[in-house]
Curated annotation (Swiss-Prot):
Protease among keywords: no
GO biological process entries: symbiont-mediated perturbation of host ubiquitin-like protein modification; symbiont-mediated suppression of host innate immune response
Metal-binding listed as a keyword: yes
Molecular function GO terms recorded: metal ion binding
Keyword entries, A-Z: Early protein, Host cytoplasm, Host nucleus, Host-virus interaction, Inhibition of host innate immune response by virus, Metal-binding, Modulation of host ubiquitin pathway by viral E3 ligase, Modulation of host ubiquitin pathway by virus, Ubl conjugation pathway, Viral immunoevasion, Zinc
Native species: Human adenovirus C serotype 2 (HAdV-2)
Cross-referenced InterPro entries: Adenovirus_E4_30/34
Gene Ontology cellular component terms for the protein in this record: host cell cytoplasm; host cell nucleus
Domain of life: Viruses
Phylogenetic placement of the source organism: Viruses, Varidnaviria, Bamfordvirae, Preplasmiviricota, Tectiliviricetes
Name of this protein: Early 4 ORF6 protein
Signal peptide boundaries: none
Primary residence: host cell
Motif extent (Nuclear localization signal): 239-255
Subunit structure: Interacts with E1B-55k.
Length: 294
């Protein structure tokens, strides 16, 4: 034995602590935006096409965290990679991979209980499934997606964000969850009906954003760089701006439809379930989550 307590011939490998690995990313900040995309229903995303179920095949699996429960409940995770990847990584994505805007899915209907550590299935749309390039691309995609999962720790740190933004909001326009990665804050909004997407998206601007109209959800992803330092006051300003955009979308929907819009009756109870999972690791039963309070 050596004086340092390490057996002779063995060296200690430098490892990061779990705390530093799970904190939101403060290093590798991305530069300011060069080109900004806008959520639109007239044109496809310039880099990430819509998901085609005929060509999709699973390439990897990544375990989630309790802080990503907001995405688990909607069973889809939309990742606009052009917002969070570097220029070199985007070159790899364009030339070597065939990834859609919503590359991660999950099935929670078999267990009907959410504990926060479910596995996400990542898929691609290449023409040669099972090839070496497909397998290697799946590993690269999994490493990027793990950073996205770690970035969902934003919901653990600012657990009040959803409660403030969704206060008295109708179910037609709701905030789902957030991701903070490389100085970029991704804000996920869900528009309930397809007709509302056709009314809201052309009538207003969400800024640097992306739109995904999938099988299960209609998701608008907003990108915010104002709260890059993760200070409390800047995040609260971000929440106020997000709520202002949501209220504008609600007004557009109210003008286009004749039905009255009421505040979501289940949202407050759902927030209690999510808070109990994040703070006390209490699992969420889907029957209780979807039930309407009397």
């Amino acid at each position: 034995m050596t004086t340092s307590g390490v057996p002779f011939g063995m060296t200690l490998r430098p490892t990061r602590s779990r705390l530093s690995r799970r904190t939101p990313y403060s290093r590798d900040r991305l530069p300011p935006f060069e080109t900004e995309t806008r959520a639109t229903i007239l044109e496809d995303h310039p880099l990430l096409p819509e998901c085609n179920t005929l060509t999709m095949h699973n390439v990897s699996y990544v375990r989630g965290l309790p802080c990503s429960v907001g995405f688990t409940l909607i069973q889809e995770w939309v990742v606009p990679w052009d917002m969070v990847l570097t220029r070199e990584e985007l070159v790899i994505l364009r030339k070597c991979m065939h990834v859609c805007l919503c590359c991660a899915n999950i099935d929670i209907m078999t267990s009907m209980m959410i504990h926060g550590y479910e596995s996400w299935a990542l898929h691609c749309h290449c023409s040669s499934p099972g090839s070496l390039q497909c397998i290697a691309g799946g590993q690269v995609l999994a490493s990027w997606f793990r950073m996205v999962v770690d970035g969902a720790m934003f919901n653990q740190r600012f657990i009040w964000y959803r409660e403030v933004v969704n206060y008295n909001m109708p179910k037609e326009v709701m905030f789902m969850s957030s991701v903070f990665m490389r100085g970029r804050h991704l804000i996920y909004l869900r528009l309930w009906y397809d007709g509302h997407v056709g009314s809201v998206v052309p009538a207003m601007s969400f800024g640097y954003s992306a739109l995904h109209c999938g099988i299960l959800n209609n998701i608008v992803v907003l990108c915010c760089s104002y709260c890059a330092d993760l200070s409390e006051i800047r995040v609260r300003c971000c929440a106020r701006r997000t709520r202002r955009l949501m209220l504008r979308a609600v007004r557009i929907i109210a003008e286009e439809t004749t039905a009255m819009l009421y505040s979501c009756r289940t949202e407050r109870r759902r927030q209690q379930f999510i808070r109990a999972l994040l703070q006390h690791h209490r699992p969420i039963l889907m029957h209780d989550y979807d039930s309407t309070p009397m």
